[in-house]
């Protein structure tokens, strides 16, 4: 089982070999999880249950302007990359076009293969993420090629109320994956 060291963005040299018995489940997580080419033809389709997990917001700024799912995803990524990968806003913004191409190629074509959908968006998360990302986006210099992108996100965040409720977010919340303080990763 490969392991990625996200602090340097490379595969770690050590891994584990797993052996499963017939009654043991396998959970495949990640952008390729729904890709049918991932499993060998010997795998019995009747034993497979696929779940598509994504941030699929249904929130609106008003009666005419919805918050796009991509807005939630880029906020999550900006905060997570800064908090856990020591990545600047410019670095993450610079990778966003590649991330979107990867979604179009490796995720969206296979989402219909899912047997179930799990929406991970929380109603209050944009208000929480704003606290982390807003001041960092304000520091992107005007001469940066990502300045316009940063300003667009700041403009969007200006419509969002702040929420200082971190103490009330449980350590098992999906939001903790992005802001830190979760039960699962140290």
Question: Each predicted region: which residue ranges?
Answer:
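ATP-dependent small-molecule kinase phosphotransfer cores
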Residues: 1-26, 87-99
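Structural recognition of the conserved hydrophobic beta-strand(s) that form the central parallel beta-sheet
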Residues: 25-29, 52
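Short beta->alpha connector loops
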Residues: 31-34
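Conserved NTP phosphate-binding and transfer environment spanning the P-loop NTPase/kinase superfamily
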Residues: 36-186
């Amino acid at each position: 089982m490969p392991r990625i060291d996200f602090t340097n963005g490379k595969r770690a040299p050590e891994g584990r070999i797993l052996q499963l018995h017939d009654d043991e489940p396998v959970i495949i997580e990640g952008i390729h999880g729904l890709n049918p080419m991932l499993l060998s033809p010997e795998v019995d389709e009747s034993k497979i249950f696929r779940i598509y997990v994504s941030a699929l917001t249904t929130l609106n700024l008003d009666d005419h302007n919805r918050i796009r799912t991509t807005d939630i995803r880029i906020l999550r990524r900006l905060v997570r990359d800064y908090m856990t990968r020591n990545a600047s806003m410019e670095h993450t913004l610079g990778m966003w076009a590649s991330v979107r191409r990867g979604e179009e190629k490796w995720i969206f074509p296979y989402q219909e293969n899912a047997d179930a959908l799990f929406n991970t968006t929380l109603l209050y998360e944009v208000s929480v993420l704003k606290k982390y990302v807003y001041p960092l986006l304000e520091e992107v210099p005007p001469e940066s090629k990502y300045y316009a992108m940063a300003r667009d996100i700041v403009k969007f965040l200006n419509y969002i109320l702040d929420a200082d409720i971190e103490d009330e977010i449980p350590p098992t919340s999906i939001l903790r994956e992005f802001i830190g303080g979760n039960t699962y990763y140290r």
